[in-house]
Amino acid sequence: MVPTRNRPMLRILGFFICAAFIYLSFRDLWLNHKGKAKLGFVKRNGTQFVVDDKPLYVNGWNSYWFMDHAVDEHSRNLVGEMLEAGAKMGLTVCRTWAFNDGGYNALQISPGRFDERVFQALDHVIAEARKHDVRLLLSLVNNLQAYGGKTQYVKWAWQEGVGLSSSNDSFFFDPSIRNYFKNYLKVLLTRKNSVTGIEYRNDPTIFAWELINEPRCTTDVSGKTLQDWIDEMTGFIKSIDDKHLLTVGLEGFYGPNSPKGLTVNPEQWASQLGTDFVQNSNSSNIDFASVHIYPDHWFHNQTFEEKLKFVVKWMQSHIEDGLKELKKPVLFTEFGLSNQNKDYEPSQRDKFYRIIFDVVYKSAKRKKSGAGTLVWQLFMEGMETFNDDFGIVPHEQDSIYKLMIEQSCRLGKVTGRLKEQKLKELCSHRH
């Protein structure tokens, strides 16, 4: 039994022990989220990305599945594990979906109705990225049907009796649907992160916003419909958030308004999609251009070597456009080689990656507009069902793993960032 005279002292001691425990428990969380509040926003200086007035060339990846996995507590850990794996390779930017419209684990259940549980999952993704010093390129809607996309918006309009057309492309011209999307944008941009306490529009963890993944508007091949939509939506975004960079999310095809580029397109069909790389990227509120690289999807009868030649020509054309026409950075936001090709060999993927990395590295050395690449896609062990023939698990293909680290080191040398501790350690042990 404790003597009565000692009880006040024990209470005081207990209080300080409890306070110390709470401090130690939450110190790392506080440092990870609050202590990095001075992280600089990525900006644009001509054809270069800059952070704190220093050039930034991107070596990154795609993991579109982050928010979806963060909803479930049993799979949430995969987000942090993937970000940690990326950071250990010196990767600096991850592109992921900030949308899920209708369907399972929907962020937006119906126009203007959001699932707080899913929003908190996205909060977690952003907080984890901040923790691992990785920035996020967040895509805002899908042109494809996966995760809802423009098709879901059109369905909503029809269900509410306000749709003008059953065409999926009415997403771009229907006033009611435009208002649906604007409402979503406003809610997302002004969202206060439940983990960090920072509004999305004020969070430098977000590298940039991507307006739409792979837009196409085949009902108007002139490109006017899509261009009007881009101009309106980018202006709306900038009126709410003028701190973050903004890109369209293009595949990079040239339209009728860019006759010189038509010879660079993979085939004639690419000019009939209602998009135009130069015109769309030249919109005044667009800060950098985006391009994809998928010769497997775009050609059916070419040999592997012919595809490699196309890739170099494709990339160089867009880099020159960025330098001379747009005067903006060009980021290759998706690239991949399918392992389901006839006569596929793992060494082909090595060659494919090497050529793409080399083009960007040479552009960076010459201070041209090639601003970086994002591999499609990376995932973790046990996620084979998410592999769309392009996916890679870090470490499983050692040659690719080493190529990605080498690119991080090469770009770090160009920018002078090799002196930064994490990159210095990574690159000094590379050999």
From Swiss-Prot:
Substrates-to-products reaction catalysed: Random hydrolysis of (1->4)-beta-D-mannosidic linkages in mannans, galactomannans and glucomannans
EC number(s) reported in the record: 3.2.1.78
One annotated GO biological process: seed germination
InterPro entries, A to Z: Glyco_hydro_5, Glycoside_hydrolase_SF, MAN-like
EC category: hydrolase
Keyword flag Signal: yes
The entry's keywords: Glycoprotein, Glycosidase, Hydrolase, Secreted, Signal
Cellular localization per UniProt: Secreted
Glycosylation sites: N45, N168, N282, N301
The organism's place on the tree of life at top rank: Eukaryota
Active site per database record: E214, E334
Positions annotated to bind substrate: W97, N213, Y294, W376
Secretion signal, residue range per the UniProt entry: 1-24
Gene3D superfamilies reported in the protein's UniProt record: Glycosidases (3.20.20.80)
GO MF annotation: an example: mannan endo-1,4-beta-mannosidase activity
Expression (tissue specificity): Expressed in stems.
Cellular component annotations (GO), alphabetically ordered: extracellular region; Golgi trans cisterna
Intrachain disulfide bonds: none
Keyword Glycoprotein found: yes
SUPFAM superfamilies to which the protein is assigned, alphabetical: (Trans)glycosidases
Similarity section: Belongs to the glycosyl hydrolase 5 (cellulase A) family.
PANTHER family documented for this protein: MANNAN ENDO-1,4-BETA-MANNOSIDASE 5, PTHR31451
Name listed for the protein in its UniProt record: Mannan endo-1,4-beta-mannosidase 5
Organism: Arabidopsis thaliana
Gene behind this protein: MAN5
